[in-house]
């Protein structure tokens, strides 16, 4: 949002800020009705008057003298009692007489009240003969312009009461969230409506402009409907209520980090839910933005993405031939290895807020969860996968890729590749049978969903490393992927530990290696940050590959827990 002014908030003042807000907000409001509503609300005279009063009081509060103490009345009483016990000189008698005067006592009492800021009136005790069934009354003030109120009313045939019959979504009443179906209408702008017909009340409403004041008796809520089932959600973004200008009370807000599990306690408010952090001993719920509200905000805040396709003409295999990956290193060709236009559009439309989750523990006999490794080129995915395979060949396995090129003499079907015709490969692409695919020298290469199913059907853990934008195709109840993001250490550690290491590059099956360059390190860091920023909400485990042995031990321990312990997964994965 553009800056409101080059002046600071204290120099501008709340009143001046209020006057420029409509013009500043206009570029960000698409609906003409919403623009009209904002102009009417900010142009309301009573609102401007309240702001002026607020500024006057604020100015006085800033320069007002600070009271020395807030017990002047009791101090004067103690002094009077002390003086009366002393010898009765003329000065003492005069002072005692002065302090005993009612107006002096009242003055000191007012002083103490102001010093303590005890402005709220003391309510009398409730009478003993109070009617428990007496209705409570709510005063509601709505600001509307020429648009309809967005609510219909009816007259109860038995009691004659005027009731709210329907709330139209998107109308002024709906946006306010203050008027509900079943509320009894008692007054409109101070005019009693008990003896009026609905048509007369509608006429009063249609003739009213600006602010409309309602006196209503809230309807009785259905207790069965107000009881909400227990719901757990995974936070897909970081949230700090202290930085949220929209939250009604910052002190009541609940902060959380991406990946935290929250228990939603109430969704009564469409904008602010009440939730608790799972596992937190604090029993008090806090306010968090609702899913719909946060999605709307992120959609407004999110900049329009600039699509950058990865260009390459070379293809690389991840150490073992069965692990299919596409290279991005050769920039001489304009041919895109990935058909990523469709997936890019999906990613920009996907606004990460919350995901409803539940606990899942793999039962004996169930298929293993698919293990997906994600990371930038050169970070060491291939080495980690190779070490896992060597550690237990009966437990871990990888997929066999498909290709449209001809089989060579030393190759066997289903060992190095699944060899299929180009026409069949293109048909499988159209039928979305590939997780990812690419083309090199006129031949297609790809990893199919069936190849993953083949590994899982053998009761083995399938190890797969893919580009992060393909994760959306794998996040299904069938695969229940456990996504591990492997990131590089800081660039200083990369220079220390990988300066003499080799990065694999290859053309077709002929692999070669070369030393890491400074450009490789910078590209690795940059790609890692991009992946984490854009897809971090999909990662269940993040491992920093500073030391390969340590990283491998951490990965193997995490995979052991996946098989033996309960984990939070999307609730949709357990409903299929």
Curated annotation (Swiss-Prot):
SUPFAM superfamilies, per the entry: L27 domain (SSF101288), P-loop containing nucleoside triphosphate hydrolases (SSF52540), PDZ domain-like (SSF50156), SH3-domain (SSF50044)
Domain L27 residue range list: 10-64, 65-122
CDD domains: GMPK, PDZ_MPP3-MPP4-MPP7-like
Keywords: Cell junction, Membrane, Repeat, SH3 domain, Tight junction
Domain of life: Eukaryota
Domain PDZ, first and last residues per copy: 139-220
Cell location: Membrane; Cell junction, Tight junction; Cell junction, Adherens junction
Keyword Repeat: yes
GO biological process, one term: protein localization to adherens junction
Domain SH3: 228-298
Bilayer disposition of the protein: Peripheral membrane protein
Cellular component aspect of the GO annotation: adherens junction; bicellular tight junction; cell-cell junction; plasma membrane
Domain Guanylate kinase-like intervals: 368-560
Family annotation (InterPro entries): GK/Ca_channel_bsu (IPR008145), Guanylate_kin-like_dom (IPR008144), Guanylate_kinase_CS (IPR020590), L27_C (IPR014775), L27_dom (IPR004172), L27_dom_sf (IPR036892), MAGUK (IPR050716), P-loop_NTPase (IPR027417)
Family of the protein in this entry: Belongs to the MAGUK family.
Its biological purpose: Acts as an important adapter that promotes epithelial cell polarity and tight junction formation. Involved in the assembly of protein complexes at sites of cell-cell contact.
Name of this protein: MAGUK p55 subfamily member 7
Organism: Danio rerio (Zebrafish)
């Amino acid at each position: 949002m553009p800056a409101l002014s080059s002046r600071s908030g204290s120099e501008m003042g709340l009143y001046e800020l209020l006057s420029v807000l409509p013009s500043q907000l206009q570029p960000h409001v698409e609906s003409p009705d919403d623009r009209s509503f904002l102009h009417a609300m900010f142009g309301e005279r009573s609102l401007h008057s309240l702001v002026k009063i607020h500024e006057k009081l604020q100015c006085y509060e800033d320069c007002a003298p600070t009271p020395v103490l807030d017990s002047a009345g009791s101090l004067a009483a103690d002094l009077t009692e002390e003086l009366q016990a002393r010898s009765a000189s003329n000065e003492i008698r005069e002072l005692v007489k002065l302090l005993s005067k009612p107006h002096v006592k009242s003055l000191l009492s007012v002083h103490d009240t102001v010093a303590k800021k005890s402005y709220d009136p003391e309510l009398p005790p409730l009478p003993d003969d109070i009617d428990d069934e007496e209705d409570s009354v709510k005063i509601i003030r709505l600001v509307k312009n020429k648009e309809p109120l967005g609510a219909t009313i009816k007259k109860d045939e038995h009691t004659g009461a005027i009731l709210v019959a329907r709330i139209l979504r998107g109308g002024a009443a709906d946006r306010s969230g203050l008027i509900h179906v079943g509320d009894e209408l008692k007054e409109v702008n101070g005019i009693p409506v008990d003896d009026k017909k609905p048509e007369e009340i509608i006429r009063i409403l249609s003739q009213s402009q600006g602010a409309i004041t309602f006196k209503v008796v809230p309807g009785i809520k259905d207790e069965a409907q107000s009881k909400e089932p227990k719901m757990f959600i995974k936070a897909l973004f970081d949230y700090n209520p202290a930085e949220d200008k929209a939250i009604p009370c910052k002190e009541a807000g609940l902060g959380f980090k991406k990946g935290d599990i929250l228990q939603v306690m109430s969704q009564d408010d469409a904008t602010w839910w009440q939730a608790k952090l799972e596992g937190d001993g604090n029993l008090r719920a806090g306010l968090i933005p609702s899913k719909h509200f946060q999605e709307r905000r992120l959609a407004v805040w999110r900049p329009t993405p600039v699509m950058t396709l990865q260009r390459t003409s070379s293809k690389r295999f991840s150490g073992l031939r069965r692990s299919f990956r596409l290279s991005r290193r050769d920039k001489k060709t304009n041919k895109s290895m990935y058909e990523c236009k469709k997936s890019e559009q999906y990613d920009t439309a996907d606004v990460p807020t919350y995901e409803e989750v539940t606990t899942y523990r793999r039962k004996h006999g169930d298929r293993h969860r698919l293990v997906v490794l994600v990371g930038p080129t050169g970070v060491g995915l291939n080495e980690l996968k190779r070490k896992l395979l060597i550690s237990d060949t009966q437990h871990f396995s990888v997929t066999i890729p498909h290709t449209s090129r001809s089989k060579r003499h030393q190759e066997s079907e289903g060992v190095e590749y699944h060899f299929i015709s180009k026409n069949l490969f293109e048909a499988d692409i159209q039928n979305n049978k590939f997780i990812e695919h690419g083309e090199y020298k006129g031949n297609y290469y790809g990893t199919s969903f069936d190849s993953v199913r083949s590994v899982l059907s053998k009761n083995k853990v399938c190890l797969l490393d893919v580009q992060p934008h393909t994760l959306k195709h794998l996040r299904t109840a069938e695969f229940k992927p456990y996504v591990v993001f492997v990131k590089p250490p800081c660039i200083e550690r990369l220079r220390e530990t990988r300066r003499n290491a080799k990065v694999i590059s290859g053309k077709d099956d002929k692999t070669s290696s070369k030393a890491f360059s400074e450009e490789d390190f910078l590209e690795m860091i940059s790609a890692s940050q991009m992946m984490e920023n854009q897809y971090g909400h999909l990662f269940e485990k993040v491992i920093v590959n500073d030391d390969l042995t340590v990283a491998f031990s951490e990965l193997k321990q995490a995979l052991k827990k996946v098989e033996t312990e309960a984990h939070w997964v999307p609730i949709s994965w357990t409903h299929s």
